[in-house]
Every structure is written in C-alpha cells, then in structure tokens.
Amino acid sequence: MKLFILPILLSATTALASPIVGTWHCVGSDENIHSDTKVEYLQDGSFRGDAKLKVDDDGNVLAYHVVGRGKWRFANNALTQSQIKYSEVSRLHSPETLAWLEESEDGQFLESMIYTGLVAQMDKPGEDEVYQLDKTGKLVSEDGTAREVCTKVK
C-alpha cells in the first residue's frame, strides 16, 4: 500500500513546487505575425491560454482571438505543452481592416486561409510546444524566425 501512495505524493509535491504553476504573459513574433497571450498553468498539469493574434499584411492588420487548452510538463528547465486544442476562435478586425477586406480579393483569400487554419485546430491537437526557462525566470521559445517570451505575473 505504501508503494502506491509514494508516487502520488511525489507527483503532488512536484506540481506544488513547480516554478511554472501560475499565470504567465507571453509576447511572440514571427515575421509579420504577433501574439499577446495570457496562460494559466494549473497544478493538475493542464493549462488554458487566451491569445490575441495579429497578422500584418503591408499595414492591413488581421486580428483574431484564440482560446486553447492542453497539458504541460516541466523537466530539466524545459516546459512542454502538449495536446493543445483550440476551444474558441473569433475575428477581431478593425473597421479599417474590414473595409480593406471588402475591396481586396487577395486580402479575402489571406484572411480566409488564416481563419480556416485556426478553426482547423479546434478539431485536432496541435504539435507540442517547448519553452526553455532562462536564468531570469522567463520562458523562451525560438524556432527559426519565431520567438516567444513569457513572464510570470502571478
């Protein structure tokens, strides 16, 4: 009986002691895409993210709101998010962007492609995302031209 309780106690202690549990603010960029995200990491190993994404197409900004959930684990100063699924995707376009979309077929095509891609992630989990905890206590993810930095806020 004691052998079964020990792993449960150890995993509970690890989650409670994890520097990841709490609320984080993340800012990311990848060429013409910018994100501003609030992520809540819970002790049970799950997380919920609420993001605003902006895509700049020569001054015309397409904006979206995305809410997602998934699982997380932290080992060797690396945070891995897995089973990431979007539960909500909505458009946040400005009146200026809406006017541009009414007149631009290329803009309509781009907007449709982006929105369809985001909605597609509601049906199936996305790829794992990995962040490194740096010396300053920030989570950093870099992949080619993409970079995201997260700061713990509480």
Language-model features: where?
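Lipid interaction determinants
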Residues: 17-75, 80-154
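Sec-dependent N-terminal signal peptides
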Residues: 2-14
